[in-house]
Amino acid sequence: MADGNTRFTVDEALVAMGFGKFQIYVLAYAGMGWVAEAMEMMLLSFVGPAVQSLWNLSARQESLITSVVFAGMLIGAYSWGIVSDKHGRRKGFIITAVVTFVAGFLSAFSPNYMWLIILRCLVGLGLGGGPVLASWYLEFIPAPSRGTWMVVFSAFWTVGTIFEASLAWLVMPRLGWRWLLAFSSVPSSLLLLFYRWTSESPRYLILQGRKAEALAILEKIARMNKTQLPPGVLSSELETELEENKNIPTENTHLLKAGESGEAVAVSKIVLKADKEPGFSLLALLSPTLMKRTLLLWVVFFGNAFAYYGVVLLTTELNNSHNRCYPTEKQLRNSNDVNYRDVFIASFAEFPGLLISAAMVDRLGRKASMASMLFTCCIFLLPLLSHQSPFITTVLLFGGRICISAAFTVVYIYAPEIYPTAVRTTGVGVGSSVGRIGGILCPLVAVGLVHGCHQTIAVLLFEVVILVSGICVCLFPFETSGRDLTDSISASKEPPSASV
């Protein structure tokens, strides 16, 4: 047995064991959840127009079908984040899988518009648990390869969007939208089927003082990866910090830099309370230690969601509006198959987006990757301020989707990294909730304004939101590439030399 004074943290254990068979299983499970969410989101591009013609809905009623999903996600992302920080990651994502599958399957039997709205809102409530799965997966990944493997995880979203576009192309013309809804709920059921083989996050367990359980899971990882744990005793990051600082009462008491004593005691109580009781984690997100990164992240999540789903909806809406808003032009759209083709082609834009983010995320860092992609997306959308041909429109939206999907991929890597384990899923969940507000407003612009032949105003709004998001990325306090994840809020202060 190693010297009892030798200690190792979860991060050190994960680095020592490397990325192996255990992480592949975790990736497959979390990836299936990401496929499920992507499919449920992408089908909105097809179901809305289908029920609009079936039930004679107005443009506002059609856009509401998408907006209520985001409204449900707004509530769900916050709620499931709190649940998973308080009761564990596994309990958080199993509840969301049940809600998503049941509501998604039942929505195929909606007898009228109101029932469809209610059930799709419940689907959104379940889909709000997506950040819990992402955080759970992240907490098993060794720091040196975290960026690359998070991009691989994001590839499952791309697989889901392409699979949904293919499924819609095959199912909609023959069987209709109800069958599409039923088939799209299948991936969520697989999460229920394989749930019993999942493991709780060792980071969460050790933060709760359940060291024996955390150690058992780390030993399981070592066995499956055919490696060994570091010598010594498993220790939490907070214990290590307190041990190192036990002879420095000023910093240990205040948990803040010198000169902030006026509010130090109050803040330290919030921080320590959040470390022990996740119910206080929302308050901790707005403490001086985390406030700047939290507010900036909210803006970036809003902008990414608003732009991403906007580009998805514009792929069908802009080309459909050409004949309506420019009646003197040659009628180019003769069948609904063209819409399926456009969405199918546009979905493939996410593959180069993934490749770009994979190439940039560890080399250039998270911040530079996000900012460059957001600003480039602005350039692609700029010509759409005026009317373009359907071909040029599709090409520009293809380029815009490459960029915004790359930016969205990186923000889902960066967001969990800037928060400690004590508030990670709450922080990402609340940020994702703010992003859902962007999703709620997005159809009002991409569908409502475009239907009203206000393409210039719609595209201008997207340009402004994306530009502001890019600026906020530049203002993030530090880079996370290659850094260890922190567990306690008190250990998550900005590094002395934050990279820009």
UniProtKB/Swiss-Prot annotation:
GO biological process: monoatomic ion transport; N-methylnicotinate transport; nicotinate transport
Subcellular localization, as worded in the UniProt entry: Membrane
Keywords: ATP-binding, Glycoprotein, Ion transport, Membrane, Nucleotide-binding, Transmembrane, Transmembrane helix, Transport
Tissue-by-tissue expression: Expressed in pollen.
Topological domain spans for side Extracellular: 45-62, 119-120, 172-174, 315-341, 388-401, 451-456
Matching Gene3D superfamilies: MFS general substrate transporter like domains
Intervals, Cytoplasmic compartment: 1-23, 84-97, 142-150, 196-293, 363-367, 423-429, 478-500
GO MF entry, a single one: N-methylnicotinate transmembrane transporter activity
PROSITE patterns: MFS (PS50850), SUGAR_TRANSPORT_1 (PS00216)
Annotated InterPro entries: MFS_dom (IPR020846), MFS_sugar_transport-like (IPR005828), MFS_trans_sf (IPR036259), Sugar_transporter_CS (IPR005829)
Alphabetized SUPFAM superfamilies for the sequence: MFS general substrate transporter (SSF103473)
Keyword Nuclease attributed: no
Positions contributing to ATP binding: Y137, L138, E139, F140, I141, P142, A143, P144
Glycosylation positions in this chain: N56, N319
Entry-linked Pfam families: Sugar_tr (PF00083)
Residues passing through the membrane, by range: 24-44, 63-83, 98-118, 121-141, 151-171, 175-195, 294-314, 342-362, 368-387, 402-422, 430-450, 457-477
Protein's job: High affinity carnitine transporter involved in the active cellular uptake of carnitine. Also transports organic cations.
Family classification: Belongs to the major facilitator (TC 2.A.1) superfamily. Organic cation transporter (TC 2.A.1.19) family.
Entry protein name: Organic cation/carnitine transporter 7
Higher taxonomy: Eukaryota, Viridiplantae, Streptophyta, Embryophyta, Tracheophyta
